Amino acid sequence: MKPFTELNGRVAPLDRANVDTDAIIPKQFLKSIKRSGFGPNLFDEWRYTDHGEPGQDCVNRPKNPDFVLNQPRYEGAQILLTRDNFGCGSSREHAPWALEDYGFRVLIGSSFADIFFNNCFKNGLLPIVLPAPEIDELFRQCEATDGYRLKVDLATQTIVRPDGKTIAFEVDPFRKECLLNGWDDIGLTLRHADRIRTFEEKRRADHPYYFVA
Protein backbone atom coordinates (compact mmCIF):
# COMPACT_ATOMS: atom_id res chain seq x y z
CA MET A 1 0.00 0.00 0.00
CA LYS A 2 1.28 3.48 -0.87
CA PRO A 3 2.16 5.50 2.28
CA PHE A 4 0.26 8.70 2.95
CA THR A 5 2.01 11.57 4.71
CA GLU A 6 0.74 14.85 3.28
CA LEU A 7 -1.02 16.12 0.20
CA ASN A 8 -1.54 19.51 -1.39
CA GLY A 9 -4.32 18.66 -3.80
CA ARG A 10 -7.20 19.97 -5.85
CA VAL A 11 -10.67 19.43 -4.40
CA ALA A 12 -13.76 18.11 -6.19
CA PRO A 13 -17.09 18.82 -4.41
CA LEU A 14 -19.70 16.05 -4.60
CA ASP A 15 -22.68 17.83 -3.07
CA ARG A 16 -24.87 14.79 -2.39
CA ALA A 17 -25.76 13.02 0.85
CA ASN A 18 -26.19 9.25 1.25
CA VAL A 19 -23.98 8.31 -1.70
CA ASP A 20 -24.05 4.51 -1.62
CA THR A 21 -21.46 2.03 -2.80
CA ASP A 22 -23.52 1.07 -5.85
CA ALA A 23 -23.30 4.69 -7.00
CA ILE A 24 -19.56 4.72 -6.31
CA ILE A 25 -18.96 1.55 -8.35
CA PRO A 26 -22.03 -0.19 -9.86
CA LYS A 27 -22.55 -3.90 -9.29
CA GLN A 28 -21.70 -5.04 -12.84
CA PHE A 29 -18.06 -4.07 -12.23
CA LEU A 30 -17.61 -6.27 -9.15
CA LYS A 31 -16.57 -9.39 -11.07
CA SER A 32 -12.90 -8.44 -11.00
CA ILE A 33 -10.79 -8.64 -7.82
CA LYS A 34 -7.63 -7.16 -9.38
CA ARG A 35 -7.92 -3.96 -7.26
CA SER A 36 -6.98 -1.84 -10.28
CA GLY A 37 -8.71 -0.57 -13.40
CA PHE A 38 -11.86 0.65 -11.64
CA GLY A 39 -11.12 4.38 -11.94
CA PRO A 40 -12.81 4.88 -15.33
CA ASN A 41 -16.02 3.42 -13.87
CA LEU A 42 -16.06 5.44 -10.66
CA PHE A 43 -19.57 6.97 -10.34
CA ASP A 44 -20.27 5.33 -13.70
CA GLU A 45 -24.02 5.99 -13.82
CA TRP A 46 -23.48 9.68 -13.03
CA ARG A 47 -20.41 10.31 -15.20
CA TYR A 48 -21.79 8.79 -18.41
CA THR A 49 -25.12 8.96 -20.21
CA ASP A 50 -25.02 5.37 -21.46
CA HIS A 51 -24.96 2.05 -19.58
CA GLY A 52 -21.47 0.89 -18.66
CA GLU A 53 -20.23 -2.68 -18.86
CA PRO A 54 -16.97 -4.35 -17.71
CA GLY A 55 -14.16 -4.13 -20.24
CA GLN A 56 -15.77 -1.23 -22.10
CA ASP A 57 -13.50 1.51 -23.44
CA CYS A 58 -14.63 4.59 -21.51
CA VAL A 59 -12.61 7.14 -23.48
CA ASN A 60 -15.27 7.72 -26.11
CA ARG A 61 -18.36 7.11 -24.00
CA PRO A 62 -20.86 10.02 -23.87
CA LYS A 63 -20.29 11.99 -20.67
CA ASN A 64 -22.70 13.90 -18.49
CA PRO A 65 -21.34 17.49 -18.65
CA ASP A 66 -23.11 18.46 -15.43
CA PHE A 67 -21.36 15.85 -13.28
CA VAL A 68 -18.59 17.29 -11.15
CA LEU A 69 -15.80 14.97 -12.30
CA ASN A 70 -16.48 15.88 -15.94
CA GLN A 71 -15.96 19.60 -15.34
CA PRO A 72 -12.49 20.89 -16.36
CA ARG A 73 -12.08 22.95 -13.19
CA TYR A 74 -11.98 19.75 -11.12
CA GLU A 75 -9.73 17.75 -13.42
CA GLY A 76 -6.97 15.94 -11.53
CA ALA A 77 -8.66 16.30 -8.14
CA GLN A 78 -7.13 14.19 -5.38
CA ILE A 79 -9.46 15.27 -2.59
CA LEU A 80 -13.19 14.49 -2.67
CA LEU A 81 -15.48 16.70 -0.59
CA THR A 82 -18.68 14.88 0.36
CA ARG A 83 -21.82 15.11 2.46
CA ASP A 84 -23.42 12.89 5.14
CA ASN A 85 -23.28 9.10 5.14
CA PHE A 86 -20.92 8.68 2.19
CA GLY A 87 -20.27 5.03 1.31
CA CYS A 88 -23.52 3.64 2.69
CA GLY A 89 -25.23 0.56 1.24
CA SER A 90 -23.71 -2.83 0.57
CA SER A 91 -20.19 -3.63 1.67
CA ARG A 92 -17.85 -3.74 -1.31
CA GLU A 93 -14.13 -3.09 -1.14
CA HIS A 94 -14.32 -2.18 -4.82
CA ALA A 95 -15.63 1.24 -3.74
CA PRO A 96 -12.35 2.45 -2.19
CA TRP A 97 -10.47 0.65 -4.98
CA ALA A 98 -12.32 2.75 -7.57
CA LEU A 99 -11.76 6.01 -5.68
CA GLU A 100 -8.05 5.28 -5.26
CA ASP A 101 -7.64 4.14 -8.86
CA TYR A 102 -9.25 7.37 -10.08
CA GLY A 103 -6.65 9.36 -8.15
CA PHE A 104 -8.31 10.33 -4.87
CA ARG A 105 -6.22 10.03 -1.70
CA VAL A 106 -8.40 12.01 0.73
CA LEU A 107 -12.15 12.08 1.38
CA ILE A 108 -13.61 14.84 3.55
CA GLY A 109 -17.19 14.65 4.79
CA SER A 110 -19.44 15.03 7.80
CA SER A 111 -19.94 11.26 8.17
CA PHE A 112 -19.10 7.97 6.47
CA ALA A 113 -20.66 4.52 6.58
CA ASP A 114 -18.73 2.38 9.07
CA ILE A 115 -17.59 -0.49 6.82
CA PHE A 116 -16.67 1.85 3.99
CA PHE A 117 -14.78 4.08 6.44
CA ASN A 118 -12.63 1.18 7.63
CA ASN A 119 -12.09 -0.14 4.10
CA CYS A 120 -10.69 3.25 3.08
CA PHE A 121 -7.86 3.02 5.61
CA LYS A 122 -7.05 -0.52 4.49
CA ASN A 123 -6.66 0.67 0.90
CA GLY A 124 -4.57 3.81 1.30
CA LEU A 125 -7.37 6.40 1.47
CA LEU A 126 -7.68 8.93 4.28
CA PRO A 127 -11.32 9.63 5.21
CA ILE A 128 -11.64 12.77 7.34
CA VAL A 129 -14.74 13.60 9.37
CA LEU A 130 -15.41 17.29 10.06
CA PRO A 131 -18.39 19.10 11.64
CA ALA A 132 -21.16 20.01 9.20
CA PRO A 133 -20.50 23.80 9.43
CA GLU A 134 -16.87 23.24 8.38
CA ILE A 135 -18.05 21.08 5.47
CA ASP A 136 -20.54 23.77 4.43
CA GLU A 137 -17.78 26.39 4.37
CA LEU A 138 -15.46 24.15 2.35
CA PHE A 139 -18.22 23.62 -0.21
CA ARG A 140 -18.80 27.38 -0.44
CA GLN A 141 -15.12 28.12 -0.96
CA CYS A 142 -14.56 25.26 -3.39
CA GLU A 143 -17.50 26.14 -5.62
CA ALA A 144 -16.50 29.83 -5.64
CA THR A 145 -12.83 29.28 -6.50
CA ASP A 146 -11.39 27.65 -9.61
CA GLY A 147 -8.55 25.27 -8.81
CA TYR A 148 -9.45 25.19 -5.10
CA ARG A 149 -6.82 23.26 -3.15
CA LEU A 150 -6.31 22.02 0.39
CA LYS A 151 -3.16 20.92 2.18
CA VAL A 152 -3.70 17.81 4.27
CA ASP A 153 -0.99 16.78 6.74
CA LEU A 154 -1.58 13.42 8.40
CA ALA A 155 1.34 13.68 10.84
CA THR A 156 -0.05 16.89 12.38
CA GLN A 157 -3.68 15.94 11.63
CA THR A 158 -4.41 19.29 10.03
CA ILE A 159 -6.02 20.72 6.91
CA VAL A 160 -4.86 24.13 5.70
CA ARG A 161 -7.27 26.16 3.56
CA PRO A 162 -6.09 28.64 0.89
CA ASP A 163 -6.99 31.51 3.23
CA GLY A 164 -4.54 30.14 5.80
CA LYS A 165 -7.07 28.77 8.28
CA THR A 166 -6.00 25.48 9.85
CA ILE A 167 -8.59 22.81 10.61
CA ALA A 168 -7.70 19.96 12.99
CA PHE A 169 -9.11 16.48 12.47
CA GLU A 170 -9.16 13.26 14.47
CA VAL A 171 -7.81 9.91 13.31
CA ASP A 172 -7.35 6.61 15.12
CA PRO A 173 -3.66 6.28 16.13
CA PHE A 174 -3.36 2.76 14.73
CA ARG A 175 -4.93 3.74 11.40
CA LYS A 176 -2.68 6.79 11.28
CA GLU A 177 0.46 4.70 11.78
CA CYS A 178 -0.61 2.25 9.09
CA LEU A 179 -1.23 5.02 6.55
CA LEU A 180 2.01 6.84 7.34
CA ASN A 181 3.96 3.62 6.80
CA GLY A 182 1.91 2.14 3.97
CA TRP A 183 0.89 -0.95 5.94
CA ASP A 184 -2.16 -2.85 4.72
CA ASP A 185 -3.33 -6.08 6.41
CA ILE A 186 -0.78 -8.16 4.51
CA GLY A 187 2.00 -5.72 5.29
CA LEU A 188 1.12 -5.78 8.99
CA THR A 189 1.24 -9.58 8.99
CA LEU A 190 4.61 -9.68 7.21
CA ARG A 191 6.10 -7.42 9.88
CA HIS A 192 5.75 -10.41 12.21
CA ALA A 193 7.07 -12.99 9.73
CA ASP A 194 9.94 -14.09 12.02
CA ARG A 195 7.61 -14.69 14.97
CA ILE A 196 5.15 -16.55 12.76
CA ARG A 197 7.95 -18.73 11.38
CA THR A 198 9.24 -19.50 14.90
CA PHE A 199 5.74 -20.43 16.05
CA GLU A 200 5.20 -22.74 13.07
CA GLU A 201 8.55 -24.47 13.59
CA LYS A 202 7.81 -25.04 17.28
CA ARG A 203 4.31 -26.29 16.49
CA ARG A 204 5.69 -28.75 13.95
CA ALA A 205 8.25 -30.00 16.48
CA ASP A 206 5.70 -30.31 19.32
CA HIS A 207 2.92 -31.85 17.22
CA PRO A 208 4.49 -33.66 14.24
CA TYR A 209 1.36 -35.79 13.77
CA TYR A 210 -0.47 -32.67 12.52
CA PHE A 211 1.87 -32.55 9.54
CA VAL A 212 1.81 -36.16 8.32
CA ALA A 213 1.71 -36.14 4.54
Swiss-Prot record:
Among InterPro entries, the record links this protein to: 3-IsopropMal_deHydase_ssu, Aconitase/3IPM_dehydase_swvl, AconitaseA/IPMdHydase_ssu_swvl, IPMI_Swivel, LeuD
Q: Name one GO biological process term.
A: L-leucine biosynthetic process
Which CDD domains does this entry report, sorted A to Z?
Answer: IPMI_Swivel (cd01577)
CC per GO annotation? 3-isopropylmalate dehydratase complex
Name the catalysed reactions.
(2R,3S)-3-isopropylmalate = (2S)-2-isopropylmalate
Q: Which UniProt keywords apply?
A: Amino-acid biosynthesis, Branched-chain amino acid biosynthesis, Leucine biosynthesis, Lyase
Q: Which major enzyme category is it?
A: lyase
Provide the assembly information.
Heterodimer of LeuC and LeuD.
Q: Which PANTHER family match?
A: 3-ISOPROPYLMALATE DEHYDRATASE SMALL SUBUNIT, 3-ISOPROPYLMALATE DEHYDRATASE SMALL SUBUNIT 2-RELATED-RELATED
- What name does the UniProt record give this protein? 3-isopropylmalate dehydratase small subunit
